[in-house]
Amino acid sequence: MDRRLGFHYFQDINHYQSRDLALWLPELKALNAGWMVLKSPATMAIPEEFIASLVSQGINPIIDFDLQVNTQVRPEELRVILAAYAKWGVKYVVFFRSPNTKAAWVDGTWSNGDLVERFLDRYVPFMRMAEQNGLVSVFPPLQPGGDYWDLSFLKKLFQLVQQRRSLDFGSNLHMAVSAQTFSRPLSWGAGGPLQWKMPRPYTKNEIGEEDHIGINTWEWYHHLVKSTLNITPKLFLFWFGASSIYQNTLDPSLTFDSLYEQFNSARDNRAADSILGCLFWVLASPSGDPRENTSWFDDQGKPKQPSIAAYKEKLEHTRKQEVEYPVAGKVAEWMYPIDHYLLLPSYEWGVPENTLDRVRPILRDSRPTIGFSLIEALNARKVTVWNENAAFSEKDIDMLRQ
């Protein structure tokens, strides 16, 4: 099953104890989460037990240092912490806050000129330090719009990268991208500049036009990267489902289930293959914290929306239906003309209408050969049996195991 769903964890550093693991790990497993953004101080590492426990369950931590761009912290000061994180199984780090916002810069330094170039000069040494420790530095999420228009910021940044020919910035470009809705429809801005006119900074959209300031910001960034650097970036959708992280609001019209379906529908877009993770904002916050209004769970682990429980039930049902049986290895691998076969049930009256809809995640992730023939399935190296309503008997399954 798909493991690209994830969460932003508590926005403090006080929930990394054994009791927190005991509370949240079962929930994350039940939701089939594959990613977790964790806030980290620059002076000490998150406990190894917490990191290692997530990794052992297939949950990839993304370490977020949340540094102001021109803080006094130097890359060398993070060497030991980064080495520890890499040793414990971490692969991705984010160093800075949204650099196109004034809040990301030390007071009095925002208007010093050459903002984008100053950021790039600051960012590259941290990126190199991450690489030296076997980690990938994820480009920080820009605020759509922002105090410095985000699309202009990116375009200027990529122009600088091209000018500095020795800077191998784009070969392994990973970006965090805002997926805030700003209370706009989930379809807002879908298709990016291939569908809509490029918006002018800080001006009202023309009648009938849509811009990038919504949940589909990633499509606009993806196009900008491809058109300027001619590479395909790897993307993490940050703050997914928040109306605005700065106003601490969730869109009341959205449910967990509808947001997940939005993510699934976006994946029908070929560009969505570049999305590594979809990080919901926010898993939980302490009682009384302003972000409590935007959390999906309370601080005791109780879901705030019935749709979360319904989603978990749907996942559990899928787990029971989707059973993979590796074909017996008595014959050399090259003897199997089919690599992966998805065996679907059929009945005298036909095929259930919703079967193909329900197996779409398997089709997207594995691209198997699809069929209804047990005999044909015997020619595959691996068979996934969609055993809905016990359509296949134990005798059928045993044939595949032999």
Where are these regions (language model features)?
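Catalytic-core region of carbohydrate-active enzymes that cleave or remodel glycosidic bonds
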Residues: 58, 84, 121-128, 214-274
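Boundary/entry segment of secreted carbohydrate-active catalytic domains
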Residues: 1-43, 324-369
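Aromatic-rich peripheral "rim/lid" segments of glycoside hydrolase catalytic domains that contact
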Residues: 4-27, 247-331, 398-401
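Acidic (Asp/Glu)-rich catalytic clusters
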Residues: 1-2, 22-31, 44-62, 80-90, ...
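Alpha-helical scaffolding within the catalytic cores
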Residues: 18-24, 43-52, 73-83, 148-167, ...
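Substrate-binding cleft of extracellular glycoside hydrolase catalytic domains
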Residues: 41-43, 49-153, 391, 397-402
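Acidic-and-aromatic substrate-binding clefts and catalytic sites of carbohydrate-active enzymes
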Residues: 9-21, 34-49, 67-77, 100-103, ...
